[in-house]
Amino acid sequence: MPLKYTIVNLVASSNLNATLDLYNLAVSIPNIEYEPEQFPGAILKLKEPKVSMLLFKNGKVICSGASSEKQIAQAIRKASKLIHEVQKQVKVQKTVHYNVVNLVATANLNQNLDLFQTAMKLDNVEYEPEQFPGAILRIADPKLTLLLFKNGKMICAGAKRESLLKKGLKVASELIIGKKKKKTSSADKAKEKAGTSEKPAKTREKTAEKSP
């Protein structure tokens, strides 16, 4: 059975394909913050969906805080509408194009872990409890980083697609606790039992045929 997970943060990039006047946007839209002496981009905070967006002068946008790709699309569409009201050269995006750059999720192995033993067993695990209470597992394929905790909880980062997240969690689970053996069903057990009971009967029949 696949490991259950919860997406807690999805980061994506997009482009509004227009030059933005960040000063003008910050003055006109209440939920935009712009402090160029501290950071070159403006910050747009949406309440629904609850997503934060970095806006840059060249029209590039970085979204974070979403829990699904649907929320990313909704946020970019909503942002383009807000900005279009102030700067008409920015088109309202009906079809939203974006690239997922990072996907962060939590999962649970539902068993306690011996992190010292895990670090000894696996070369790609780092564990320095005096610096951080969790162990760091790095997977090459797919390229993901996981934080492992003693209570079996994990935080996974680095996936760019949900399919890669699922694959990475499966790989991590098999590395840490091993592959689970397939359970034998009641029907299979009955077949095995029937097969073993038939063999002696056939042997008796052959013996009976040979005897005078």
Over which residues does each language-model region extend?
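Intrinsically disordered, low-complexity polar/charged tails and linkers
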Residues: 1-145, 151-153, 159-212
